[in-house]
Every structure is written in C-alpha cells, then in structure tokens.
Amino acid sequence: MLIEIPSEIPREIHGETQGETQGETQGEQLMCLPEHALFWSRARTLFVADVHLGKAASFRAAGVPVPSGHSSFDLDRLSLLLNSHQATRFVILGDLVHDESSYTAALDQNFRAFRARHRHVEMVLVRGNHDRHAGEAPAEWGLDAVAEPYALGPFQCCHEPNAARGAGFELAGHLHPALRMQTAREAITLPCFWRHARGLVLPAFGSLTGKFSVRLKPGESAIVVAGQQLFRRTHQQ
C-alpha cells in the first residue's frame, strides 16, 4: 500500500496488504505497522502516539480496580519494534505518561530498564496534553522533551492534529482514531491510521486506551488495523 504525495500536502493512499503498509512522501518512505506504529525507513525512526504509561496505576489511585501490568507489556512491545526495525530514533507523538500519579516506583524501574536496553536510541517526546499535566519525566529516562510542532525532515511531529497549521506533512496522535464498520445486524470498531488533508493521525499505542470513531470526509482514507492485518478504507466505502 503506497501513500503518494505529489506535493507538500498529501493527496491519496493507494493499494493494500495484509501486513505492513508502505508509503512515500517527498521521496521518503513510511511504513504503517499493525502494532500501531509508524516507521520511517531511511532515517530508521519509529513513531508511536498515546502510550499512556501508568494509566492503570492512575485508575487504581482513584479507587478503580484496574489490573496492573499494562505498562510493562507496552514497553516490551516497544522493545520488540525498536529491535526488529533496528531503529536509531524513537519519537513519541505525545501522551507517553497518563498523569502525575502514573509515576510509580514500578514504572520508573521498568522504563529505566527499557532505556538501558536501548541506550543508543535517540528518544524524543513531543509533549502532549497528558504529559504537560503529568510533569517532567525523570532525567534518567533519557528523553528529549520538545513542544509541538517538532520539525523532523519533511515532517511536522505533533500531538494534536492541525498543530502544525499546514506547515508540512503532519504526523500526530491525540484522537485515538478508529473506524466503525457495520452490516445490517452488527458493527465493529477498529483502530486506524487516519489519513486527512494535512497528514496522518496514528492510532493509540497503549494497550489500555479508548478509541474515537472518525468519519471519513471526501478525499480522506484510513488504514485499519485488524489484529496483524491492515486494510484500506476510503470515504466511499
């Protein structure tokens, strides 16, 4: 599946596959992954959005009995992606941590171990709304925290869509996009990469996150994640 960008503003997505989805923008190749991540092959850069580490701890602190283990599971998922794609740069498009109460001793220990496993990977956090409320991550986590939009090659890295104000091809998160599909008798909502007029919104990476159903407008499309398979939907479908 190719994302063809004939000018600075993206126009259309072509093709489909059951595994990884590749596209091109201004001579660069992007790969949508069924693990809810995006890989820029030439720059060996992995993008994710909305990890929400420590969300379960935040819920438990509020008296909601949510099981633990989601954060360590998600960090292991990230390790697999960084290793399998030999990434040298890791960009989080906002909301790495859920809130201030998420910074538990267990999360700190798990993230430090994760960082040690990937000590040679540059890690950039584009601050999202949850990151701003949670406060700065420990210095030992080794994150370069930046404000949006963060320019990286031809891309404007943001947390919230439209934060780049049309300055370039935008990569964003925040919305946790999903697409609702239905028959006459039943419906299903699946996470997706939402392709809009200014760029691409990534699905939430965190395993303990919700979804927001998007309605495709003319000219928009979605790369839908169904387990380990990806497929494309357009406004007309």
What kind of region is each of these model predictions?
Residues 1-93, 98-237:
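Extended recognition/assembly regions associated with phosphoester-bond processing machinery
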